[in-house]
UniProtKB/Swiss-Prot annotation, chains A, B:
One of its GO terms (cellular component) is cytoplasm. Signal peptide: none annotated. NCBIfam families: PRK00051.1. Its EC number is 3.5.4.19. It is found in: Cytoplasm. Belongs to the PRA-CH family. SUPFAM superfamilies: HisI-like. Pathway: Amino-acid biosynthesis; L-histidine biosynthesis; L-histidine from 5-phospho-alpha-D-ribose 1-diphosphate: step 3/9. This is Phosphoribosyl-AMP cyclohydrolase. GO terms for molecular function: magnesium ion binding; phosphoribosyl-AMP cyclohydrolase activity; zinc ion binding. Keywords: Amino-acid biosynthesis, Cytoplasm, Histidine biosynthesis, Hydrolase, Magnesium, Metal-binding, Zinc. Mg(2+) binds at D94, D96, D98.
Amino acid sequence: MTSSSPTGGGPGRPSALAPEIADRLKRSADGLLPAIAQQYDTGEVLMLGWMDDEALHRTLTTGRCTYWSRSRGEYWVKGDTSGHFQWVKSVALDCDADTVLVKVDQVGAACHTGTRTCFDTDVLLADQ
Amino acid sequence: MTSSSPTGGGPGRPSALAPEIADRLKRSADGLLPAIAQQYDTGEVLMLGWMDDEALHRTLTTGRCTYWSRSRGEYWVKGDTSGHFQWVKSVALDCDADTVLVKVDQVGAACHTGTRTCFDTDVLLADQ
């Protein structure tokens, strides 16, 4: 692990995220924030990923939603492998700066299983 | 801390959650899953809370969204203090069973700051 950069990197990874954002993030013990991806026009909740400071920085500046893969330990531009990009429309933090909401335009399926969202299959309680 | 119950309690807390659900949950190190609350008809993402097995069980069986408060270390029925209940309409797990999506009918403001959602104020990137 490298040390955090002076420009606001999360624990272990340097980042170019603006300090005025980085300074108020409330990260988990592993330096991450949950990031909800929502289809900007239909309102569908597509998936939840994780971002460190640099993933948030890249999401804000590249126009493509970028996560930190906890399983692979690397940055992950959604769509780089599948072509199912998430084009960023807007980004907001929640009231205590520990969660990210990214509104996106999802190309194709958000879920690696091929369904539109990651929440389509495992329904525990149906419409009440 | 008490030990987990044989019926599927998360680390440290007993739970009556059905074993067929509990057995496939992929919890964080502290035994929790992020839970996204979404307004069922408008699609607004209202907030993100955290659930352990028992909070999920209560959400599924009481009709009111129930979280585990990480800061207070106790169960938290949304609305018990504020009156801003979240009436549960549907509950789903994501494709790898580590995130919950609860569609609710939100009474009043979801956010403790008084805004409708927790994502209304801190916009990092506006509509592109």
